[in-house]
Curated annotation (Swiss-Prot):
Gene (name only): queC
Biological-process GO terms, alphabetical: queuosine biosynthetic process
Superkingdom of this protein's organism: Bacteria
Free-text comment on the cofactor: Binds 1 zinc ion per subunit.
Protein name: 7-cyano-7-deazaguanine synthase
Top-rank EC class of the record's enzyme: ligase
InterPro entries (UniProt xref): QueC, Rossmann-like_a/b/a_fold
Cofactor(s) in the UniProt record: Zn(2+)
Lineage: Bacteria, Pseudomonadati, Pseudomonadota, Gammaproteobacteria, Enterobacterales
Binding site for ATP: 8-18
Family membership: Belongs to the QueC family.
HAMAP family named among the record's database cross-references: QueC
Amino acid sequence: MKRAVVVFSGGQDSTTCLIQALQDYDDVHCITFDYGQRHRAEIEVAQELSQKLGAAAHKVLDVGLLNELATSSLTRDSIPVPDYDANAQGIPNTFVPGRNILFLTLASIYAYQVGAEAVITGVCETDFSGYPDCRDEFVKALNQAIVLGIARDIRFETPLMWLNKAETWALADYYQQLDTVRYHTLTCYNGIKGDGCGQCAACHLRANGLAQYQKDAATVMASLKQKVGLR
């Protein structure tokens, strides 16, 4: 039996990964992390979606220690989430240092426990917010370290790594789940479900990608299929 673990936040990217994983694997487990995030409404959304979409199991882990150690606008109410700024440079204050290091490590331990061959994460280096732990070189380096550290060939999969946001919308549509992703996921840094607040960087990337896809769906879908080998 092919089994995978999806690092699942209930947002657009991880939900799209879950939708695809359910087609590719016989048994799919979700793992969600509660680190006291500002947008922790995502945890309830993730639980609802994992059940709705048909995941075999869903584990929610308390990793409150991350909140104590990592200073970010997503872990401190006293730090405001900035509005989207096309001219912003550097790493934004929404970056949570060590988050993906911790999440992927714990997901790998869980994969070891349940006998999964893959850990799937929705990180992306094409349309992203500049987080260093979303880069392909980081994911590959950590994957190598995990394999060495647990002596188990657990594979990290990043199906969205080289897709832009329009192509990510196309992928959800390919599996006939675009409305599920649009109306039932939570991507917004301010914790607003669906189309979100419309002001933060996460909402901007999501809305811009949807607009691009809706403007020329056929071209975007063709690009997606060519990139990932879909028919």
